[in-house]
Amino acid sequence: MKYRELGSTGLRVSEIGLGGEWLQRHTDAEVCAVFDACDECGINVVDSWLAAPDVRTRIGDALRGRRDRWVIEGHIAPTWQNGQYVCTRDLKYVEPAFRDLLDRLHTDFLDIGMVHYVDRPDELTEMLNGSPFMRYVQKLKSCGNIRHIGISTHNAAVAQMAAQSGEVDVILFSINPAFDMLPPSEDMSLYFADEYRSDVSGQIDPARARMYALCAQRGVGIHVMKAYAGGRLFDARTSPFGAALTPVQCLHYALTRPAVASVMVGCDTPAHVYAAAAYETASESDKDYASVLAAAPKHAYGGQCTYCGHCAPCPAGIDVAMVNKFTDLAALQPEVPDGVRSL
């Protein structure tokens, strides 16, 4: 495993990281097995925005006895209300949710306190102007409960503002070849629209390119989410390029962007961990994404869910992300897989 400096934080992180979002439906033993596989492969950084108490406990128990070897990136703003995830800046909910996170992870600090899901420039402006929420985050840093401040966003304009602010050390940003062709927006639906905007199709959006360069200049580290676009890039039928990319190609694309230190890969099983870590021994030809992109059509990216869960909470209590995931798994097969049918 190769390790990279995370901006100016002084942290060295494995270039393959663990995204914890798919651990929520697994047992204690299964979650522990994923962390065992990560240790075996040299992975030392985990990102988790999950608010559900049970999965926080499972991750914390899996980290017990190895906390000092792991860089933990935990999110501030996800809360658990009435059995559902709710993202809020209301300190009445945020403060107990953060204390709960530390307690369940069996630690008294997070290496990175990630301000969760900031996609609107006006919201970031309010935070940077000293909102109560941001004052709380800064207090956590001054007290040592978080060592570095991060922001997660899908919007390059927000990421650029964060990098320029001097307040943010790390940005968690969605990076893959498809998303790089889309314009910055606070409307996430554009990332899954039927077509790319014509003036950015086939080339990296200039705003995203500027943001990557600015982060490299300012020493702001980038962690990557959605490198696989929810698995859509692995199938020619769902890829905007009309041809499938491999996990290795997607990882290489993300890791060759300026300022990127690590890609957070969502892993259900040890096999997923090993598949991601195989990047480290892949040949240059295996990593070559350029040949696929060179033949990419200019338009027609069919809109699809990437199961991020940001549409929550559902008024009817439905786990929309998981319903969409299993629907898509079924639709890609001639018959409904047994594993989906049994759910």
Locations of the language-model features?
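Active-site groove signature of glycoside hydrolases
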Residues: 100-124
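Acidic-and-aromatic substrate-binding clefts and catalytic sites of carbohydrate-active enzymes
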Residues: 23-29, 47-57, 79-81, 88-89, ...
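N-terminal binding-site loop/beta-alpha segment at the start of enzyme catalytic domains
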Residues: 1-76, 80, 108, 142
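Short amphipathic alpha-helices and their capping/turn segments at secondary-structure boundaries
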Residues: 2-7, 56-65, 94-105, 159-166, ...
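Active-site mouth loops of central-metabolism enzymes
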Residues: 19-29, 79-95, 124, 235-244
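Short, acidic/polar
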Residues: 25-38, 89-106, 153-161, 245-253
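Conserved, mostly hydrophobic/aromatic
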Residues: 6, 18, 38, 46, ...
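Beta/alpha (TIM)-barrel catalytic core signal, keyed to glycine-rich beta->alpha loops juxtaposed to Asp/Glu
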Residues: 118-343
